[in-house]
Amino acid sequence: MNNLQTHISSYLEYCLAQKRLDEKTIKAYRIDLIQFYNEISISDPCKIASYDLEKYIEKMHLKYKPKSVRRKIASIKAFFHYLEYKNIILQNPFNKIQIHFREPVILPKTIPLYIVEKFLFTIYKQRSAAKTNYQKRNALRDAAIVELLFSTGIRISELCNLKISDVNLIDGVILIYGKGSKERILQIGNSSVLNILKEYKNDFYNEIVQCNHFFSSQSGKPLSDQSVRRMINKYASLSSIDLHITPHMFRHTFATSLLEADVDIRYIQEMLGHSSINITQIYTHVAVSKQKDILINKHPRKDFHF
């Protein structure tokens, strides 16, 4: 049966089983493709022409921001490549469409380093001032999480998905399964970070084994993205920090700090798990303070004397 809805279901199963995409990506694909199916009003994919796609894209531009439209088009385009690959359609209507975007560059938001230090200080202070063992253990785990976010640039989804077998604290190495099931290895280069992770693992060992995730609640359940976000908000409030801090901002700060320290951008790309260096290059626009330092201290005009 050549039904668009049936092919969408088959494609999502293919993405899960063959392409091994993560649940969040598949969820986004599902939303985009079901929306497309509901709007297009054509049940047979063979009858969808370039004109139909162009009209649909025009409608999306009226409803969504360019970034959202780009993502939705990418979802639909990947689906039609699948239909072509499976010989379900003879011609891909996307082949006759030229899509151009001019998006404003949105720079990653970073956390000033003095605020990162203040944030970490607050967590350690809460731990030392804890009145109950429960509070003390929570603060220990929270310190381990924030230290890892800042010291490795790991994504929050990657952190929450870490298994006990992915973390080798003897050698200070973490195996990360990133976007698209891409593997990368990260080193823990700071001894203080390594020590707090070891202390956390020893204290939470039973809970970690119980849920098979490295970061666990005290009831032995894996930590969710949302629970980490709530924890970040809690310590930002306790620190009296007048800045909305998200877990991903630690990743941006990690990358920008390394770039400002003259680390080769290709090393940063590898550590962040970016598929293209073009993605990493966004951080070159952020390092304004480094640019100023270079122009003050490196430009030859400073040696001119009249």
Curated annotation (Swiss-Prot):
Occurrences of domain Tyr recombinase (ranges): 106-296
Matches recorded under PROSITE patterns: CB, TYR_RECOMBINASE
Localization, UniProt: Cytoplasm
Catalytic residues identified in the record: R155, K179, H248, R251, H274, Y283 (o-(3'-phospho-dna)-tyrosine intermediate)
Domain of life assignment: Bacteria
GO cellular component: cytoplasm
Residue intervals of the Core-binding (CB) domain: 2-84
UniProt cross-references to Pfam families, sorted A to Z: Phage_int_SAM_1, Phage_integrase
GO biological process: cell division; chromosome segregation; DNA integration; DNA recombination
Keyword rRNA processing attributed: no
Keyword annotations: Cell cycle, Cell division, Chromosome partition, Cytoplasm, DNA integration, DNA recombination, DNA-binding
GO MF terms, alphabetically ordered: DNA binding
InterPro entries on file: CB, DNA_brk_join_enz, Integrase-like_cat_sf, Integrase_catalytic, Integrase_recombinase_N, Integrase_SAM-like_N, Tyrosine_recombinase_XerCD
Function: Site-specific tyrosine recombinase, which acts by catalyzing the cutting and rejoining of the recombining DNA molecules.
Family, as annotated: Belongs to the 'phage' integrase family.
Record-given protein name: Tyrosine recombinase EUBREC_2677
Organism the protein comes from: Agathobacter rectalis (strain ATCC 33656 / DSM 3377 / JCM 17463 / KCTC 5835 / VPI 0990) (Eubacterium rectale)
